[in-house]
């Protein structure tokens, strides 16, 4: 570890909507939604082909190499 970087969190890679994304190791689904500025939108989240209920977003931690798909509803006519 480089001097002065003691407070940097360890990171991991996940697949987010098909793209490799580097995130802190301790991130939850709720944290990710907030980071993506989607917290005010209606979203559906799937991790490794399993749908995650919105009620579990705050408790569901992501893990290295998870495959995450996030979709959000867009109104239209």
What are these language model-derived features?
Residues 1-76:
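Ubiquitin-like/PB1-type beta-grasp interaction modules and other compact soluble beta-rich domains
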